[in-house]
């Protein structure tokens, strides 16, 4: 995939290279939406390479795990599992973003090369 990837419905992004950024806006629901989650109890979803940034706004019930993100991760009023990712930019949480614990066996924490306001 090349360019900015705008998500407004249920995304399952597994094992892909996104040449650009991913934007997830106002997406909520069940089952859990997934942007990488190799240890999911329902199905394995390999992590992704996102060359740009990951932006999430007002979205919930997400797993974002084991991805390599070339830019920053910007989270605004979201609820999600966020584990085992590598961000070459910053990890920024705002407006009450909630980071949920992952399932047993999930990696813990994220590697962030810039500022981290989510801890």
Locations of regions flagged by a protein language model:
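Feature marks extracellular polysaccharide-active and adherence modules
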Residues: 2, 8, 14-15, 19, ...
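Short, solvent-exposed linear patches
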Residues: 28-29, 59
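Short, surface-exposed beta-strand/strand-loop-strand elements in extracellular ectodomains
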Residues: 34-39, 84, 99-107
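Long terminal segments
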Residues: 101, 108-119
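A generic structured-segment signal
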Residues: 11-12, 43-44, 62, 80, ...
């Amino acid at each position: 995939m090349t360019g900015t990837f705008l998500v407004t419905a249920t995304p399952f992004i597994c094992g892909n290279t996104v040449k650009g950024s991913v934007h997830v806006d106002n997406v909520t629901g069940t089952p859990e939406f997934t942007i990488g989650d190799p240890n999911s109890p329902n199905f394995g979803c390999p992590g992704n390479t996102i060359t740009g940034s990951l932006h999430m706004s007002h979205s919930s019930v997400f797993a974002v795990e084991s991805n390599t993100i070339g830019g920053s991760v910007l989270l605004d009023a979201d609820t999600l599992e966020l584990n085992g990712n590598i961000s070459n930019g910053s990890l920024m949480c705002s407006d009450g973003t909630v980071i949920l614990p992952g399932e047993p066996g999930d990696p813990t924490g994220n590697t962030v090369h810039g500022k981290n306001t989510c801890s």
